[in-house]
Structures are given as structure tokens and as C-alpha cells.
């Protein structure tokens, strides 16, 4: 049993051929994810400007950038379940087209008051649900031993937030407040048409027949749903929190200009994006548990170091870049675990719940950081809390997640490659 498992675990990625069309679908899905995330993140780089122009408090500014996050996160639950039912070919064009509406509203009329921005930000959250469309689409096209890498590559589409960070403020300064929103709406429209024409679901895709409510209830009962939700809330939630709040943190804590803070946030995002497919690829080889453990350990160390508010160069920069790399790799490893342990006809539903947990994990920290800074004029307590939560996630990974569960998860692994062992036991 042990020898057979080890042989299967060590099989090279080249052992199972992947059709060229699968790579095309992966590319299309990744582009769609990036474009929708670009739209989803449009408000974050402009947060400091809205704060000054509308005389917002630190909490109001945090709320403004957090609203799209929570809506996009909760929306992933029904969107993931709908993707299981109707497929990515239908859902990707719908989500992309629907996101155009709040983008145009914000660019043309919705930036004159906090109330208008919150309304626009609420519906801007639609763009954040694209993640729950792409994962089941990509998962169905690739064999089990390639899914960690494939979903990691798809996850790199979260780099759409870097596009927003690098371009939004510059476009506003060079033209007008409406410019970045109009450009993004145009790109979304082009992608929606391209996806409708070119995107295809995998042959033989499993279509669930149960009602939506029953499928969601069954999804929540799966051990992998609860495990991955907890881990993704820390890994991806940390990434989202930094991507929306880092410009404010750097401007307030280190006195950087808005443009400089946005550029540094873009660097953080790009590194996290690059490390996400690496985390998936590495999970295919040594197992997602090991990758998660290493990633969470790095986050603990980086958060503790940054809690002392060191000089930005070099210690602060190193701490943030280390956390960016770890959060990206950890996000990739989490969905490698999902791909490994989830039944084929429930990948969309599980992705929706796990993705929601990750987004909600990114919703609370900006609010906490804004409130703590308003009360104490320091971010140290917030970073200590990040270290504590990450340490708890590390302990959870090495205990509950590391040990296989019986029941639903056992069925999920039927006919699929075993996860590489994280120890010499046969448990």
C-alpha cells in the first residue's frame, strides 16, 4: 500500500497528456478572472483621494474599499453553485457583462458622495465572483495531477488588482475620474463577447441534478469545505486585505505619496500573483499541506517583524515581500487541496464557499486596522493579530488538515491521485 501510494505520488506531470484546448480554456479563464478583478479593485487605489475629497474618517475609508470585497465574497457561493449547474461558458460572460453596470455608474455619476460610492461598490462586488466561475471550469479540463498547477495559473488572474493599482491613479491624474472606469468597462465588454464566442466547458462535465439548496447543504458538510475555508480566509484573505489597505497603510504609517504607495502595493500584488501558480505546482509535487505550513510560518514571521514598524528599507520591504510570496503560495496550495479532495460535481459549490471565506477574510482586517489606527495611531496591534491568526491556521494545518478524514472526503478521492504524503505514516 505504501509503495503503491509513493509511486503514484511521485508520478511526473508529463504522465497524463493534456489536450491543447485545455490550455486555451485556462488562458481564457485567467484573462477573464484578471479583467473582473481589475474592475473589482478600482476603488482601493482611490481610497486616499476619496478620503481627502469627501472628508471621510479612517473607518469610512476602510468601509468604502471593503464593501466590494464582502459582496464579491458572499456572491461566490451562489455563483459557484450556478457554475456547477450551467457551466463556465454561460457564467463567465454573464458575470463580466453584469460588472460593466456598476463600473459605468461609478465612473459617470457614483463618486460624488460616500453613499453613492457605497452603492456602486456594493454592485462592483459582482466582479469578485468570477473566481467561483473559473475554478470549476479549469478543474474539469485537467487531470488530477495537473490541477494544482492549472488552478494556480488561473489564480494568477488575481493580478488584475495590480493593473488597477498601477493605472487607476495615473489615469485619473492624466485625464479625469471617469477615465479608468470607462476603460475597464470597455475591456469587460470585449471579454464578455470573446468568452461567449470562444469559451467551452470540458467534455463530459458532470452536471448536478439536485436542487441548489440541497447541493449547498451537502457542500458545507464536506470536511474539505470547512478546512479549506479556514485556510483560505487567512491566505487569500490576507492578500485581499493588504491589496486594498496597503496604500492607506503606507501613506499613513510611512508618509508616502499616494502614487508611491500604489506602486508599492502593485509590487506586493505582483509577487503574490507570481507565487500562486508556484504554490500550486509545488503542491502537485510535495503536497499542499507542506506548502501551506511553510507559507503560514513565513506570514507569522513577517507580521511579527512588521508589528515593530521598522524602517521601510530594508526590513519593512523584506517583511511585506515575504508575506506577499507566502500568501500567494498559500492561496495556490489551498486550492490544490480543494482540487485533490473535492467530488467533481461539487467543485463549483466548494469553490464558492471557500472563495467566500477568503474574501470575508479580507473584509475584516481593513476595518480593524482603520479602527485601531483611529484609536491608537498605530497599526502594531493589527499586525500582531495577523500573526496570532496565522499561527492558529498553521496549527490547524498540521493537525486536522494533515490527517485524512473519513466519509465524504474518502469519496472525493475515489479514482483520483493520492495527495503526496507529508510523513512516513500510512494514515
Predicted regions and their residues:
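Juxtamembrane intracellular "pre-TM" segments in multi-pass secondary transporters
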Residues: 10-19, 201-229, 416
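Extracytoplasmic gate region of multi-pass secondary transporters
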Residues: 43-47, 224-277
